[in-house]
Amino acid sequence: MILAEMPPLDGGIVIHSGNISQAKQYLGQEHPYAIYDMRAEGDVWLNLDALAIIAGTIQAQGTLYLICPNWDTLEQQLDFDSQRWNGGKVIATPNFYRYFKALVQKFGFQFQTLEETDFSLPKQPPQCQATESLTPQQQKIFEKLPLDSSAIHLITAPRGRGKSTLAGKLAQQLAKTESVLITARSHSVLPSFWKSVAQHIPFFAPDHLLQKIAANQIAAKSWLFIDESASLPLPMLHQFCEYFDKVVLTTTTHNYEGTGRGFSLKFPQQLTKQYREWRLTKPLRWHENDPLEQFIDELLIMSPPSETNQYAEFYHLLAEAHYKTTPSDLRRLFDAQDQLLHSFSEHQRLVGGIWAVPEGDLEPELAEAIWRGERRPQGNLVAQYLCFQGNLLEACQLRSVRISRIAVQPELQKQGIGKRLISDFILQKIQQTRPLVDYVSVSFGLSEPLLHFWQQCGFQLVQITPTKEASSGYHSAMMLYPISAEGQRFVQQATARFERDLALQPFYAELQNMLPIRPLVQLQMDEQDWRNIEGFALAQRSLAASYVSLTRLYRQDPRNHGVLANLWQQFERIQGKKEWLENLRSLLANYLQYTR
């Protein structure tokens, strides 16, 4: 570990401060050394995702160099990475850096405090040459997997174990007698071995592959290989697994994206075909018990923390119980301002916990600008969405708390612990807060089990996103729990408006069997509809936020508003969306000028 400037050498890579996009270019590559430069405008910038990525590219006997200014005062320095996860505000992050420095000391990494003028990198040791032959562990899977009766195969391994090479060689072998396809998040992130065989084995982008499946233009009797499958939405993976006769998925445990055991737990739950998991454990890129790998694993809390630390224990619980938990969550948990933690332990073991953040209590002028579509400040996820998309201005003005995560140890789930956590959190934390919180909110990927869980906890459904989230493959649902008298009135208003609009929403036909709501089919315009249309025509409210009100206007007078027919379908098909929207706003503005 170097605390000074250093010049690059041939073959190495240099990452500057929080440049995650630069770091991602090196995924799947190998380098003799890497330099991570933490310096940023007189302070520091440490992006854990970027650090973990470049650490995973270093070959055996290679070195990671860290340029860190003012090591002794690191806890007091501003960290510009905090603006990503602290509502846009740059803060010092003392809790994380105390933890970080303790790990550096534990592993005994070398320090050198040097000036630019008197330093040169030491000579790099000769690198181990990569071998094309399979290890005994790889060879065993190579021979057994094609003969196994399971339809779905998941190959898991930490970085540097050769899972992509193994999968590539399997694909090459199978392609001699079978139809074989490859897919991944994008072609650019495929490891080099996959790219070398792509001319013989066709690659399909995931969305393109789904289109081929829908059009019945691709043979189901094929082997589909999915590289780094945890980076794709679970519903998409399940579609692939249902369609193809044989599917081989690879994914990285101890991943910089946080998709480790959580993926292995969640993925098999909805499979209808026989499934088998194969594991690679022996490192190929470096030696067993490599100190840098162990340091990164401990830094990202990939295993239960060896020493008592509230934040580390809580983060490990999240990583175990959640499909997507990232290093950014780790930084946020350690040092973000204005967050609430509530935990439940038994026999000195953390069993479950809730992570929540305050929202709302915004100035009326800012809330109005959010409603108009003119401001999008960071934070206030549910409050802003209800204000803008739900046409509920008060959502941003009232005081609320959003439950960001709830987690229970995987082996103890479905035993009522989650409901107990919610109840205790509201009774012990929320209802004791002064000034009193008006409501508690939660947002989650909409599925029947989760909807049922939150309803049993007393939450009421008030909003569903019109489109599915790319990261999860689900529509997002938002539910509220009233606390104050003002909150009671607001939640009743939000629920009534949601039920009034539901049958006209573009997603209703898809979700109606899941929703335990009998919608109120009301086509008559009210004042909120007119205000919504004015916000669309005269301000910057979106088509999605105004869609139901525009549909009511069309239904009220279809002869004079033919342009509003099938709005959602028009918008999805149209090429010049921006110009089309501006024309629609102009037409409605003229209409309002003569009718309102």
Swiss-Prot record:
Lineage of source species: Bacteria, Pseudomonadati, Pseudomonadota, Gammaproteobacteria, Pasteurellales
Catalyzed chemical reaction(s): cytidine(34) in elongator tRNA(Met) + acetyl-CoA + ATP + H2O = N(4)-acetylcytidine(34) in elongator tRNA(Met) + ADP + phosphate + CoA + H(+)
Extent of the signal sequence: none
InterPro entries: Acyl_CoA_acyltransferase, GNAT_dom, NAT10/TcmA_helicase, P-loop_NTPase, TmcA/NAT10/Kre33, TmcA_C_sf, TmcA_tRNA_bind, tRNA_acetyltr_TmcA
Residues reported in the UniProt entry to bind acetyl-CoA: I406, A407, V408, Q413, K414, Q415, G416, I417, G418, K419
The protein's Enzyme Commission number: 2.3.1.193
Alphabetical list of HAMAP family matching this protein: tRNA_acetyltr_TmcA
Membership in a protein family: Belongs to the RNA cytidine acetyltransferase family. TmcA subfamily.
Subcellular location: Cytoplasm
Gene Ontology BP term (one): tRNA wobble cytosine modification
Binding site for ATP: Q138, G160, R161, G162, K163, S164, T165, L166, A167, G168, K169, R285
N-acetyltransferase domain residues: 328-481
Function: Catalyzes the formation of N(4)-acetylcytidine (ac(4)C) at the wobble position of tRNA(Met), by using acetyl-CoA as an acetyl donor and ATP (or GTP).
Coiled-coil regions listed: none
Species in which this protein is naturally found: Actinobacillus pleuropneumoniae serotype 5b (strain L20)
Entries under Gene3D superfamilies matching the protein: 3.40.50.11040, 3.40.630.30, P-loop containing nucleotide triphosphate hydrolases, tRNA(Met) cytidine acetyltransferase, tail domain
Alphabetically ordered keywords of this record: Acyltransferase, ATP-binding, Cytoplasm, Nucleotide-binding, RNA-binding, Transferase, tRNA processing, tRNA-binding
An annotated Gene Ontology molecular function: ATP binding
SUPFAM superfamilies cross-referenced by the UniProt entry: Acyl-CoA N-acyltransferases (Nat), P-loop containing nucleoside triphosphate hydrolases
Gene Ontology CC terms, in alphabetical order: cytoplasm
Protein name per Swiss-Prot or TrEMBL: tRNA(Met) cytidine acetyltransferase TmcA
